[in-house]
A protein has these predicted regions:
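Metal-dependent catalytic neighborhoods of phosphoester/phosphodiester hydrolases
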Residues: 76-93, 112-127
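Conserved small/polar residues in nucleotide/adenosyl-binding loops
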Residues: 192-197
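Active-site environment of divalent metal-dependent phosphoester hydrolases
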Residues: 43-45, 80-83, 104-115, 165-168
Length: 197
């Protein structure tokens, strides 16, 4: 009975996430505009860093208002200071205020603060415009976003996390895409709106 209840809860949660995910589509002019913010390094830890963070947030707002993107993508090292939860909410605020769909791919420094990857995942997926879903261990899952054309899917945007650091003791340095991720990317799939790994 526990397995059936767990399965039903998982299916309901997945369906709920699918229902809330905004649809992405090319405009009538044939364009799809993406604003990408990478290596934001938002840090609210000291008065100086908070002042710098406010300049960053103001610049993000300016870009979003000037460009009117169809999608916002955050890639790597978004928050690199404590208190990380406050910084995550602050960096996502300009996107949420504009009701823009967005996706986050973590960098190697995001989980070095006072939040785990799962805690970051819960914050990111708490926003209505997120296209992220939670995967193994509650972390942000790899996703492929379908961008619709007038009659059929016109483009796919893959968002994969290469993780933090090497998981092999004899190899130093940063992480990489796993064989499982590469296999997921290569696998032929029937796409609906978005697929999580």
């Amino acid at each position: 009975m526990k397995k059936i209840t767990t399965l039903m809860c998982a299916v309901a949660l997945w369906c709920s996430a699918q229902a809330q995910a905004p649809a992405l589509h090319f405009g009538r002019d044939g364009k799809f505009r993406i604003a990408q913010f990478t290596d934001v390094h938002l840090d609210l830890g000291t008065p100086y860093r908070r002042a710098q963070a406010e300049k960053t947030i103001a610049q993000m707002r300016y870009i979003l208002d000037a460009e009117h993107p169809d999608l916002v993508v955050f890639t790597g090292d978004v928050v690199t200071g404590k208190p990380a939860a406050q910084a995550w909410h602050r960096v996502l605020e300009p996107v949420a205020e504009r009701n823009l769909p967005f996706c986050v791919v973590l960098g190697n420094h995001d989980a070095e603060q006072d939040l785990t990857r799962a805690e970051i995942g819960r914050i990111v997926t708490s926003y209505a415009g997120t296209l992220n879903t939670l995967g193994a261990g509650g972390e942000l899952a790899d996703v492929v976003l379908e961008i619709a054309g007038t009659k059929k899917p016109a483009a796919l945007l893959y968002c994969l996390d290469s993780h933090d650091y090497s998981t092999i003791p004899s190899i130093d340095g940063y992480g990489w895409f796993t064989q499982e991720q590469v296999g997921w990317y290569r696998a032929p799939v029937s796409y609906t709106h978005l697929r999580a790994h």
